[in-house]
Every structure is written in C-alpha cells, then in structure tokens.
Amino acid sequence: YVMISLLMCGAVAGLMCISLASPLAKKMIGMSVASATAAVSTLALFNVLGRISAGLISDKIGRINTLALACLLSIVGLYFMYISGEGDVRTFYIGISIIGICFGSFMGVFPGFTADQFGAKNNSVNFGIMFSGFAIAGYVGPTIMTNTLKATGSYKGAFLIGIAFSIAGLLLTFAYRSVNKKVNTILAAQK
C-alpha cells in the first residue's frame, strides 16, 4: 500500500498539469493558442527526459532515493507554477519543465522499483497492481484542478494541494524505508 500511495502522490502533480497544460498556459499566463501548444510540447519533452534520466540516476543512487528526489523537485515545480502569473512565461516554463521531469521520473523508475521489491517473475501483474495508484492520480489530479478553478476562478490553489501531495509522497519514501528495513530484518532472521 505504501508503494501504491507513493505512485499516486508522485503522479498527481504531473497529471494535474498534463491534462490541462494548454488551458493553464492560456488562462494563467495569457499565452496564445500557438504558445500554449509549445508549452504542452515542452512538458512532453521534459517528461521523456525524466523517464530516461531517472532510470540512469536510480541505478546510481537507488530507486527510492530517486523517487524522493522527484517528490522534492515536484514541490519546487509546483511552487513555480503557483507564483507564475499573467505574462510570466519564464516562471511558468520552469515550473512545467520541472513537473514534466518529475512525472517522467516516476513513470521511468516505478516498473524497476516494483521488480526490485517483488521480483521479476510476476512483474507484469505486480506493476499492474501498483499502477492503480496512477489510475487514482489520473482522477484526483485533474479533479483538483477543475474544482479549484470552479470554486475560486483560478488554478493557483490547486498547486498548493499538489504540493501537499508531493510532501506526502516524500514522507512515504521514508515510510517505505522503515517498512522495508523491518521486512528485511524479519527475512534475514528466518534464514
């Protein structure tokens, strides 16, 4: 459950922005349709970069450390989105790029993380179960955005909620370490 919750928390920020990147660019920053389309492409590009680079990073510093770093950077990216406003293209692009990298990091690392935890034998089934966290985030992220816009007339408050999810994800990386340490201690004692 910790891993499913971690994936959900880690994916919320990306799914908040991916689903509404063009409307965010137009409404918050005042971008034209063409410029908003470029913002969507930028998010997609950084998503791909996150998938590739996070895999390389996780091989060096470990999967859970990489996911913790992605949660931490998501907080930064969401903060940049929160402070961006009309005409503030640079801050918006910094935020959307960081969020893209972090979202890609979760998508790139989680299959290997699942295999490391449960073994390769049933990885397709196990990752399918883990992916339920992504499905939940796919509902929660966009819902936060649309409900915040309806309630306040702005997307800004949604980024604060996204930050709370990223903080929860960061805390879950510590919970995972604690649970995993206890499980490994029990398994070692049984040998």
What do these predicted regions represent?
Residues 31-40, 88, 92, 123, ...:
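Juxtamembrane helix-start elements in MFS-like secondary transporters
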Residues 105-118:
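Intracellular juxtamembrane helix-capping segments at the cytosolic ends
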Residues 117-154:
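A late C-terminal transmembrane helix in Major Facilitator Superfamily
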Residues 51-62, 149-150:
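Helix-to-loop junctions at the C-terminal end of transmembrane segments
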Residues 163-191:
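Multi-pass alpha-helical transporter architecture, strongest
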Residues 1-54, 141, 145:
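Extracytoplasmic gate region of multi-pass secondary transporters
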Residues 73-86:
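C-terminal ends and interior cores of transmembrane alpha-helices
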Residues 60-71:
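Cytoplasmic membrane-interface "Motif A"-like loop-to-helix N-cap segments
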